[in-house]
Amino acid sequence: MSDLDTSGLNIRGLDVENARDVVRRALDEDLGGPDGVDVTSSATIALTDMRTAEVVARAPGVVAGLALFALVWDDVARRLASPRLQVEALVADGARVASGEVLARASGPTQVLLVGERTALNLVCRLSGVATHTRQWADALEGTGAQVLDTRKTTPNLRALEKYAVRCGGGTNKRMGLYDVAMVKDNHKLAAGSVRAAFDAVRSRYPTIEVQVEVTTVAEALEAVAAGSRFLLCDNMSAPLLGETVRAVRGATTDRVEIEGTGGLTLARVREYAATGVDYLSVGALTHSSPILDLALDLV
């Protein structure tokens, strides 16, 4: 067992201040603002009432974001001018858990427990769902040499948390946003006139930033490599075409070129695509379509 505190959020590099901001805004939403109240709990439960509660998995899966319980309850305690809860984590983020397994235990003011219950569960169920779904893809790719990547198809304002959950599930993060990596896509190529023109424009304006290029044909892939790109996103290619593209690129340069496949991938066929020799397969569904992992908070 370990204390569940904010240090747990640093294990895989999550920005704790970002997480605190998400929690603050989520509680403001649920309570009607920073000075709002839970009208039911405040009317029925004295601040001096103390209880213990357990976070329990209602389905098997992979856990992510357990420390958010501590962040939520700390924020609630501050709002209520109440003592903080004592919280213990019984499993670590990234762990596979069974239905019925107790994941964490908390003791302290009952009001704090109940006011923060739904906000914390909403966040942790969501992140654990992303981690669980990602683990399915990571397991499907095991031994192929390919890694599963996430995308920018995330819930607004939850990107850092959801990308953390992807890592907990064994996935790899791609770019965080529009600022850290350049991605030349079809509309950029159309606006600039060609793959090379678009690549050269970005490289000229931002000489130190990585420039990735989306391609749909072997010819585009070779043009991008000739322009200087060392990361290709092969969009909506069939497995045979993806394999042909990988072979052509590997034969065209001795430089290391990372190749990603995306579009229309399914768990049933992912190993077929991995066998083409790609480095990555990106799956938007990791963050835009993952069902939650059902968790509950039970008073004991």
Tell what function each PLM region has.
Residues 2-227, 243-248, 258-260, 271-280, ...:
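Acidic/glycine-rich phosphate/pyrophosphate-binding loops and surrounding catalytic core
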Residues 220, 224-241, 265:
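Conserved structured catalytic cores and adjacent interaction surfaces
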Residues 234-235, 259-265, 283-285:
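Glycine-rich beta-strand-to-loop/alpha-helix junction loops that act as flexible
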Residues 253:
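Conserved phosphotransfer cores of two-component systems
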Residues 268:
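Residue-level signal for the nucleotide or nucleotide-sugar donor/cofactor binding architecture
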Residues 296-300:
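Active-site loop ensemble at the mouth of alpha/beta enzyme cores that anchors a bound cofactor
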